[in-house]
Amino acid sequence: MADGELNVDSLISRLLEVRGCRPGKIVQMTEAEVRGLCIKSREIFLSQPILLELEAPLKICGDIHGQYTDLLRLFEYGGFPPEANYLFLGDYVDRGKQSLETICLLLAYKIKYPENFFLLRGNHECASINRIYGFYDECKRRFNIKLWKTFTDCFNCLPIAAIVDEKIFCCHGGLSPDLQSMEQIRRIMRPTDVPDTGLLCDLLWSDPDKDVQGWGENDRGVSFTFGADVVSKFLNRHDLDLICRAHQVVEDGYEFFAKRQLVTLFSAPNYCGEFDNAGGMMSVDETLMCSFQILKPSEKKAKYQYGGLNSGRPVTPPRTANPPKKR
């Protein structure tokens, strides 16, 4: 399908038609339409910086993980684009049942509102991860492997981080011991896969840990954990007020760390049907005041209770086959 043939409006209206239908209702899309979304959005990602500089007001959302019905609930709550500006922090695919609808609506909105709708890369927007955790299988079942590869080409061009009004630093995972200057992020060339170590890996994989000073080993077997001291030093050095990241299930949909200098957002309520967590969305107004909108979990009791940010971290098992042993 030639670029001009992609009818984004038609696709968006079809994707929104399932509002109010039974959760999980499949949206009919052609392979040509989905491929067109990937190609056009990839062009837009490459035309915009890898480190986005954004202005408030906007709403920031964490992991969605294919929970399409919950994504629609978020938009119902916060306003469907272009009613509000949005920044999503990655992890659109895998685990949930409707990764295709989820990523297609997000890419369609990116194409329709390129200056008001922004998507960062999460660790699941990476072929070696989404090959395993569900997206590949969903693409293969509903379309074909070639289309999954087209998504990979698109994901390899997503921006990595954003700064809101020079004060709020946003990324999917967290900080990196290699990050001294924002220029280092700007120098990352796209398209790129996510390496196993280094700056890009850390921005997508690292986690805060209240029991760590400085840098620690990460139970995921990838990247590091970092303490409150690292957060404070980073904010001071770059004259920032807040780090906003996702990547971990948190019970209330949002959770502060390091005396409110960092916030974790997670926007998939009842994650995987196994957690009793709420989903959170952060609204940043023109004065940079942050407030939180919460999607409550459904009433049914989850299989497991979840005790907070540092209890377990089930979000993604180790990336390597043999993670480094804890010393």
UniProtKB/Swiss-Prot annotation:
Xref: SUPFAM superfamilies: Metallo-dependent phosphatases
Subcellular location: Cytoplasm; Nucleus
Gene Ontology cellular-component annotations: cytoplasm; nucleus; PTW/PP1 phosphatase complex
A GO biological process held by the record: circadian regulation of gene expression
Ranges for region Disordered: 305-327
UniProt: Mn(2+) 1 binding residues: D63, H65, D91
Cofactor: binding details: Binds 2 manganese ions per subunit.
Top EC class, one word: hydrolase
Catalyses which reaction(s): O-phospho-L-seryl-[protein] + H2O = L-seryl-[protein] + phosphate; O-phospho-L-threonyl-[protein] + H2O = L-threonyl-[protein] + phosphate
EC numbers for this chain: 3.1.3.16
Sites of N-acetylalanine modification: A2
InterPro entries in the cross-refs: Calcineurin-like_PHP_ApaH, Metallo-depent_PP-like, PP1_catalytic_subunit, Ser/Thr-sp_prot-phosphatase, STPPase_N
Oxidoreductase as UniProt keyword: no
Catalytic residues (positions): H124
Keywords noted in UniProt: Acetylation, Carbohydrate metabolism, Cell cycle, Cell division, Cytoplasm, Glycogen metabolism, Hydrolase, Manganese, Metal-binding, Nucleus, Protein phosphatase
One of the record's GO molecular function terms: myosin-light-chain-phosphatase activity
Pfam families for this protein: Metallophos (PF00149), STPPase_N (PF16891)
Gene3D superfamilies: 3.60.21.10
Cofactor (UniProt): Mn(2+)
Family label: Belongs to the PPP phosphatase family. PP-1 subfamily.
Identification of the protein by name: Serine/threonine-protein phosphatase PP1-beta catalytic subunit
Origin species: Xenopus laevis
Gene behind the chain: ppp1cb
